[in-house]
A protein has these predicted regions:
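Active-site environment of divalent metal-dependent phosphoester hydrolases
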Residues: 30-34, 88-91
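Metal-dependent phosphoester-hydrolase catalytic domains
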Residues: 2, 11-13, 52-81, 86-224
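Short glycine/proline-rich turn/loop motifs
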Residues: 25-28, 181-183
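Short interface patches used for recognition in eukaryotic signaling and trafficking proteins
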Residues: 27-33, 81-83
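Alpha-helical elements of Rossmann-like donor-binding domains used by nucleotide-donor carbohydrate transfer enzymes
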Residues: 7-9, 40, 44, 97
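Residues at alpha-helix caps and immediate loop-helix transition turns in enzyme cores, especially N-
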Residues: 34-41, 93-94
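Beta-strand-turn-beta hairpins that frame and shape the catalytic cleft
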Residues: 3-27
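Alpha-helical scaffold elements lining the catalytic groove of polysaccharide deacetylases
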Residues: 38-49, 168
Length: 224
């Protein structure tokens, strides 16, 4: 099935200490009837990010040195953030794949179709990813929805971060329940999109210097 859904990725570098951040933004097919298409898109995205991450993580000889002589040299450290409108709820195969880092070849979301290695040996990626809005012991998503329309309300948009390089310091609450009770869906005069914003404040860390702020990232995940 030919789709025009896209993903973009960029490499950010902190001027002070050289810490690198790979940020990707992606959009998966919207139709809930095609969970298999979204799985394939997720697999392709993570394969490409794995290649880019490996390429961009290498410390080049011509790479600028940290601008501060007193700052630790973290130019060899790289973190990952993936902002994605998955059009998939937390009980989907796409969510399981990104969260667990692997998915079996016979997962029902493939719908019995054959997709080469994905349905022969399964899918996997090397990143330890967590959803920024899935906090606490249960790991459940704390927002009741990220998309709110008269016909649908649910969590389908996510900010995934690599736990080996980032930790979440704060996230913003969703719309107040009292307000939601009086509207049938978005957009409306106060919310210009059916997707709500998901600002996330993250902290980078180095294994030997925990809790030291090197970078404050304000990510806004917005649906298409």
């Amino acid at each position: 099935m030919n789709r025009d859904d896209i993903a973009v990725a960029c490499l950010l570098r902190h001027k002070v200490d050289g810490y690198k951040l790979v940020v990707a933004n992606a959009h998966f097919f919207w139709d809930p009837a095609f969970s298999d298409v979204k799985l394939v898109q997720a697999g392709m995205l993570m394969e490409e990010l794995e290649d880019l991450y490996a390429k961009w993580s290498v410390k080049r000889k011509d790479e600028p040195k940290p601008s501060s002589p007193t700052a630790p040299d973290l130019s060899g450290k790289t973190a990952l953030v993936v902002c994605v409108d998955m059009n998939s709820t937390p009980d989907s195969g796409v969510y399981e794949f990104l969260f667990r880092g692997q998915l079996g070849p016979s997962h029902p979301d493939f719908k019995g179709h054959r997709y080469g290695k994905y349905t022969e040996v399964g899918m996997s990626h090397p990143f330890s990813l967590r959803s920024a809005y899935a906090q606490g012991p249960s790991g459940a998503e704390i927002l009741p929805f990220t998309n709110y329309t008269p016909g649908f309300s649910g969590v389908i948009d996510y900010i995934w971060y690599g736990t080996t390089g980032l930790s979440v310091e704060a996230v913003m609450d969703g719309p107040e329940a009292a307000y939601i009770e009086n509207v049938v869906g978005f957009p409306d005069p106060h919310f210009p999109s059916e997707y709500i914003p998901q600002p996330t404040h993250t902290q980078t860390f180095h294994p030997s210097i925990l809790n030291l702020f090197f970078l404050s990232l304000f990510v806004l995940s917005v649906g298409y």
